[in-house]
């Protein structure tokens, strides 16, 4: 009979290490905590932890956490294999719900867009939108669905080299579903409009580049229009 997971110990270990080592908590969400730490001395990395959920049965919690860790690690590996920029996977401890990965030092796309003045939009943002469109097309062509494709989940190598790096595949999956891919695009559209209210013309560049980069994307783009209409109806109804 398998040993019952020590739920409290798993929770306290993470928080004690954060406190004692004075690590930098980058983000704390409902499912995971991301921490800036070192993989080995001098090598900065990002540690993503999935703390135990006290309200969930310990064995079920560990199984779900392990599954999500493995799915995310496989998505990162698949992205690298097909040439999509994302953090390099260093190490995974699925039983503890932890993934060590490359630290990306550049700004996130959300912050980069907000810093751009109106006179620089054509010069800086249009090329970035086209690049995002082509990279998302590459993702979907290879049946990679991000699951939370927002401007906060895209980093840049630097301000001077605005190449998108996709992060946080915690809600991602491998899926052939046109619906899943269409929802990815819709989430991106909503995120762009939230980041930059006058983003409609910019998003056209994302869609154009997506269509040009993936010749079999017509069905997904048709489904995107359906998803978009459903979203607008929900907004109108409230």
Curated annotation (Swiss-Prot):
Subcellular location: Cytoplasm; Nucleus; Chromosome, Telomere
One annotated Gene Ontology cellular component of this protein: EKC/KEOPS complex
Subunit and partners: Component of the EKC/KEOPS complex composed of at least SPAP27G11.07c/BUD32, cgi121, gon7, pgp2 and SPAC4H3.13/PCC1; the whole complex dimerizes.
Function: Component of the EKC/KEOPS complex that is required for the formation of a threonylcarbamoyl group on adenosine at position 37 (t(6)A37) in tRNAs that read codons beginning with adenine. The complex is probably involved in the transfer of the threonylcarbamoyl moiety of threonylcarbamoyl-AMP (TC-AMP) to the N6 group of A37. BUD32 has ATPase activity in the context of the EKC/KEOPS complex and likely plays a supporting role to the catalytic subunit KAE1. The EKC/KEOPS complex also promotes both telomere uncapping and telomere elongation.
Reaction(s) catalysed by this chain's protein: L-seryl-[protein] + ATP = O-phospho-L-seryl-[protein] + ADP + H(+); L-threonyl-[protein] + ATP = O-phospho-L-threonyl-[protein] + ADP + H(+)
UniProt cross-references to SUPFAM superfamilies, sorted A to Z: Protein kinase-like (PK-like)
Catalytic residues, chain numbering: 148
One MF term in the entry's GO annotations: ATP hydrolysis activity
Keywords recorded for this protein, A-Z: Activator, ATP-binding, Chromosome, Cytoplasm, Hydrolase, Kinase, Nucleotide-binding, Nucleus, Phosphoprotein, Serine/threonine-protein kinase, Telomere, Transcription, Transcription regulation, Transferase, tRNA processing
Binding residues for ATP: 26-34, 48
Domain statement: This protein is considered an atypical serine/threonine kinase, because it lacks the conventional structural elements necessary for the substrate recognition as well as a lysine residue that in all other serine/threonine kinases participates in the catalytic event. BUD32 has protein kinase activity in vitro, but in the context of the EKC/KEOPS complex, the catalytic subunit KAE1 switches the activity of BUD32 from kinase into ATPase.
Start and end residues of each Protein kinase domain: 20-238
Native organism: Schizosaccharomyces pombe (strain 972 / ATCC 24843)
Family note: Belongs to the protein kinase superfamily. BUD32 family.
Designated name of the protein: EKC/KEOPS complex subunit SPAP27G11.07c
Annotated InterPro entries: Bud32, Kinase-like_dom_sf, Prot_kinase_dom, Tyr_kinase_AS
EC id: 3.6.-.-, 2.7.11.1
One GO BP annotation of this record: tRNA threonylcarbamoyladenosine metabolic process
């Amino acid at each position: 009979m398998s040993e019952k997971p020590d739920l409290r110990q798993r929770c306290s270990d993470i928080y004690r290490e954060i406190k004692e080592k004075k690590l930098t908590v980058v983000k704390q969400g409902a499912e995971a905590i991301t921490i800036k730490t070192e993989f080995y001395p001098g090598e900065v990395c990002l540690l993503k932890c999935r703390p135990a959920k006290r309200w969930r049965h310990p064995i079920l919690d560990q199984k779900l956490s392990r599954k999500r860790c493995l799915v995310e690690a496989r998505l990162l590996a698949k992205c690298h294999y097909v040439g999509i920029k994302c953090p390099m996977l260093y190490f995974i401890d699925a039983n503890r719900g932890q993934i060590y990965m490359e630290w990306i030092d550049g700004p996130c796309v959300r912050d980069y867009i907000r810093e751009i003045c109106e006179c620089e939009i054509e010069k800086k943002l249009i090329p970035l939108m086209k690049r995002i469109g082509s990279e998302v097309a590459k993702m979907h062509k290879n049946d990679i669905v991000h699951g939370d494709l927002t401007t906060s989940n895209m980093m840049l190598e630097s301000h001077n080299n605005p190449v998108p790096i996709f992060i946080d595949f915690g809600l991602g999956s491998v899926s052939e579903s046109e619906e899943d891919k269409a929802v990815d695009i819709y989430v991106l559209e909503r995120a762009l409009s939230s980041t930059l209210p006058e983003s409609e013309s910019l998003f056209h560049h994302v869609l154009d580049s997506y269509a040009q980069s993936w010749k079999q994307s017509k069905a997904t783009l048709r489904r995107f229009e359906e998803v978009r209409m459903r979203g607008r109806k929900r907004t109108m109804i409230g």
